[in-house]
Amino acid sequence: AVSTGKVDSKFGAAVETGQAMELVKLALTLPHLDLRGLHCHVGSQVFGEDVYQRTLDIMVPFLAQIRDETGVTLSDLNLGGGYGVRYTAEDEAINIPARLAELAAYLKEETERLGLPMPRFLMEPGRSIVADAGLSLYTVGSVKRIPGYKQYAAVDGGMTDNPRYALYQSRYT
């Protein structure tokens, strides 16, 4: 999994440092903006069941903090995407509808506990709905064989077609 939902991430603004609250307060002062909710993205190829629950453990109290400090109750909470896709036999098959139902129930409990209305709960299916829709097909131009060691195939494609392995060591079948 690629983790993007960390304090030191290049993406977004961290709740933990106060930067997210600063941006919320700034957005609320701008007359041309209508702040309706929060969006976060915790990673890519996420298989762990508790990742999104831990995200709710941060975001729901943050919604309450926004209400308490600004008097504004936001209506939307988007946990982004990132559910893992089963590319290899070792990857877990995820029952996304069941996981979403569990998260929605947990969100309802937590918002009720903090006296918040249930926000519109959003997630983005992303690659989980398109990952099996295509494949990469290359033509082998030549093969270099090194007896007793290995062989290499020169193809008419490369890292620019799919940089994820080089960048993140992502595995595919």
Labelled PLM ranges:
Residues V42, G81-Y83, G157-M159:
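Short, small-residue-rich loop/turn micro-motifs
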Residues E102, T111, L116-T173:
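Charged (often Lys/Glu-rich) extended helix/loop segments that serve as interaction or gating elements
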Residues V15-Q19, V46, D50, Y87-D91, ...:
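Solvent-exposed, flexible loop/coil residues
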Residues A1-D76, V85, Y106, T111, ...:
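Active-site-proximal beta-alpha core segment in soluble small-molecule metabolic enzymes
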Residues A14-E16, N95, P117:
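General structural signal for secondary-structure boundaries
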